[in-house]
């Protein structure tokens, strides 16, 4: 939030230095990130009047000017071609440091003294100006010679860049910051004159307003202004807007932006003649509707988007951006002003959906109270009247679902003291709260308060305790007796065991080329359908949030898959076609629904890849690496997860406890289609709580054998139901002490093998630590492998090398 010192002074008399003001705001919770002096590049720059221009004696393209700078006449040599005798211009004097980096000193140009320099707009850093912009800036002749240029251009303000916290939307305005300073300094807020003149006509004869969705639009106000004169705003208004980073457009648009910054109330202006039926309808959008907005982009409208419409079409995406089909233009004769309060969750959802965020959006997302439109409209009409910008039709249409009223609340002093750890005198509590506009009185242990509508963040003792301490001053804790801490036990901080496990595995995944992501642990109900979850299963039974921020985030997740697949889809849509992602997070399983006790929270690690070189065995290798340091024996079985490919996925099962540690494999093709991701997507998730409970394996160092190893390849034919894991486990047991390693390198299917049959080719390595293996010993081992495979798994030899 950007405010200026002079603007604040319209509401409160401040004699504190900018640095002191910044300190007060920062110490009370509104951190001032930067103080900018507008005149930082305008010091030693004054208004000058050119008295005489003569040709340079030694240069055809230079002229010598005698310039009145107020207290004296000085000489300046220039090559500018747009200056004339009698012109009023900005003159930078020795010692000036201009916006473009030029430092001004006395000098000579081709032998003639030049005691300063005329300035252009760029050299002064000016962005908005009445007059000639090419070459040297030509100023208004009414300006007095010697006047500091910062004063002449109304660029002598001090700008504060303030980081307003999310719970304080009332501070997203000049008046909001002024209220804070009033409480901090004890100086009263000045009463503002918001009066305006109207004609004798009735606004209802010009316009009708219908709010269909009062839940998403609890208040909508509209007024009509006739005989509008579209022109530049006066200099003071444009200077204010420029100082807070807003580009002036014209008087009507500038008024809406001025009210936005001054009172925090977003406003919009329509061209009355382009509103079909001279009617405004606030409703949900309809599928098939489209609107082209002020950024010249077109957006499809759907039923989840709140729109402001005329009788036939959307004219505004509510709370975000207006449409080109009804905006104020140079020929506008009659305008409609809008001031409204929209549901912040709805605005946030729509803003994310279309990818548009404006200053208005920022306010609505934090929350605009239901009283704000009334004050904003008054100020807008006051400015119309003050600037003579048009004729205001009598009356304001006001559709409001509930009358804005302050809240009567009670707070406990003893509970506040317990929260703060200190006792604040009752008279100080009353002084603080009353200065904040929270009219209060104390009776015994109870504070009776009347909380203003704009302080929607105050709900309980903790909130009021925060208000008291931030105004009382956190430095009070510096004087508290530290003796109770003298005998405190000091402990060494370290990661929780689960966090240690998560950190270890995350770093290993980084080594495999995985980027960590952080996703929401809440999701929409359509996840159940998109992930093919079956009703009344552990994954299907999700907890519904009582007060969701949006319909898209109304359930608590039972699997990490949805968030991961959504992130993959988002990356693919942005032409990122080859990547690996991981996430550590929690899933939540209710003991029963509806929820009667806290759910089970399970820490999970998930990772996924759309890399074209990754496959089932790549993931199997990664799993083996991640689990190699744990005392764990596990087996693989076909995965039962509905969103995994039934034939190219596996559950990891602890052989001792039969617990499922995790799952990995290819994502089900239907799920890939539902999320609009590649079919070549592989996904894995591991239960971090189970892994953390495992003992770490003690690694034993084995001597390298002095004798050569023997490699053999076998291909067998077996039933489709036989897994690779079963085959390799059988090979390992058959080899006994001679076993070193084994791996599958081919799986083959054909009609010749028979129905429901497959060929699996694998290699294995034999080694002895005592001697060189003989052919007889090798053949005996191979025969034992074939015999065990046949009798245990029904597999027969296809070929042997």
Pin down the residues of each PLM region.
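Terminal amphipathic helices with adjacent charged low-complexity linkers/tails
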Residues: 185-211, 388-416
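Conserved mixed alpha/beta core segments that line enzyme active sites in large multi-domain catalysts
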Residues: 47-77, 239, 250, 256-325
């Amino acid at each position: 939030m950007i405010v200026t010192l002079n603007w604040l002074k319209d509401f409160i008399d401040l004699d504190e230095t900018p640095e002191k003001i910044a300190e007060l705001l920062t110490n009370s919770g509104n951190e001032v990130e930067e103080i900018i002096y507008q005149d930082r590049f305008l010091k030693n720059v004054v208004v000058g009047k050119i008295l005489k221009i003569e040709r340079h004696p030694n240069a055809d393209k230079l002229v010598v000017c005698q310039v009145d700078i107020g207290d004296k006449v000085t000489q300046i040599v220039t090559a500018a071609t747009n200056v004339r005798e009698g012109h009023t211009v900005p003159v930078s004097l020795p010692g000036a440091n201009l916006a473009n980096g030029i430092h001004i000193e006395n000098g000579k140009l081709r032998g003639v003294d030049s005691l300063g320099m005329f300035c252009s707009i760029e050299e002064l850093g000016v962005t908005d100006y009445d007059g000639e912009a090419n070459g040297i800036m030509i100023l208004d002749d009414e300006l007095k010679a010697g006047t500091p240029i910062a004063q002449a251009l109304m660029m002598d303000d001090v700008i504060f860049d303030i980081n307003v916290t999310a719970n304080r939307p009332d501070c997203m305005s000049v008046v909001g910051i002024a209220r804070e300073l009033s409480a901090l300094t004890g100086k009263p807020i000045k009463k503002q004159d918001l009066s305006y003149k109207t004609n004798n006509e009735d606004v209802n004869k010009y316009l009708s307003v219908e709010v269909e969705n009062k839940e998403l639009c609890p208040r909508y106000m509209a007024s009509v202004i006739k005989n509008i004169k579209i022109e530049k705003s006066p200099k003071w208004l444009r200077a204010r807007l420029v100082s807070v980073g807003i580009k002036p457009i014209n008087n009507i648009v500038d008024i809406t932006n001025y009210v936005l910054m001054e009172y925090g109330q977003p406003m919009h202006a329509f061209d009355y003649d382009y509103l079909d039926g001279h009617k405004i309808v606030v409703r949900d959008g309809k599928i098939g509707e489209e609107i082209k907005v002020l950024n010249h982009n077109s957006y499809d409208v759907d039923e989840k988007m709140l729109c402001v419409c005329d009788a036939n079409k959307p004219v505004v995406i509510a709370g975000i951006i207006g449409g080109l089909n009804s905006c104020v233009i140079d020929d506008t004769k009659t305008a409609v002003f809008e001031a409204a309060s929209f549901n912040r969750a709805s605005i946030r959802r729509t803003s994310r959906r279309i990818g548009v965020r404006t200053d208005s959006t920022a306010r609505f997302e934090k929350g605009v109270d239901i009283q704000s439109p009334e004050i904003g409209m008054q100020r807008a009409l006051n400015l119309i009247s003050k600037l003579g910008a048009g004729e205001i039709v009598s009356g304001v249409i006001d559709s409001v679902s509930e009358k804005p009223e302050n809240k009567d609340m009670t707070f406990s002093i003893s509970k506040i003291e317990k929260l703060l750890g200190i006792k604040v005198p009752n008279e100080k509590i009353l002084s603080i709260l009353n200065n904040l506009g929270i009219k209060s009185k104390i009776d015994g242990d109870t504070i009776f308060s009347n909380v203003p509508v704009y302080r929607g963040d105050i709900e309980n003792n903790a909130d009021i305790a925060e208000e008291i301490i931030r105004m009382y001053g956190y430095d009070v804790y510096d004087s508290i007796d530290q003796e109770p801490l003298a005998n405190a036990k000091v402990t060494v901080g370290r990661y929780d065991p689960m966090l240690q496990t998560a950190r270890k595995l995350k770093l290993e995944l980084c080594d495999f080329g995985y980027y960590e992501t952080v996703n929401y642990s809440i999701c929409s109900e359509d996840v159940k359908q998109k992930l093919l979850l079956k009703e009344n299963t552990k994954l299907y039974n999700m907890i519904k949030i009582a007060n969701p921020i949006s319909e898209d985030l109304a359930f608590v997740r039972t699997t990490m898959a949805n968030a991961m697949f959504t992130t993959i889809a988002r990356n693919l849509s942005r032409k990122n076609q080859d990547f690996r992602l991981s996430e550590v997070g929690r899933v939540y399983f209710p003991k029963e629904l509806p929820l009667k006790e806290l759910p089970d929270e399970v820490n999970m690690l998930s990772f996924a890849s759309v890399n074209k070189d990754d496959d089932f065995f790549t993931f199997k290798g990664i799993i083996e690496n991640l689990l190699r340091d744990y005392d764990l024996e596990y087996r693989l079985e076909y995965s039962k997860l509905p969103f995994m490919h039934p034939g190219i996925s596996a559950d990891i099962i602890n052989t001792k406890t039969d617990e499922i540690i995790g799952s990995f494999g290819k994502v089900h093709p239907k799920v890939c289609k539902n999320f609009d991701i590649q079919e070549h997507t592989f996904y894995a998730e591991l239960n971090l709580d189970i892994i953390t409970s495992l003992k770490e394996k003690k690694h034993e160092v084995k001597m390298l054998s002095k004798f050569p190893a023997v490699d053999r390849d076998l291909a067998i034919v077996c039933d489709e139901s036989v897994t690779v894991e079963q085959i390799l486990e059988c090979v390992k047991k058959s080899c006994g002490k001679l076993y070193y390693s084994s791996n599958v390198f081919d799986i083959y299917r054909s009609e010749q093998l028979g129905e429901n049959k497959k060929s699996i080719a694998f290699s294995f390595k034999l080694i002895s630590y005592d001697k060189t293996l003989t052919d007889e010993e090798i053949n005996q081992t191979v025969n034992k492998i074939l015999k065990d495979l046949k009798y245990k798994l029904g597999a027969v030899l296809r070929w042997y090398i």
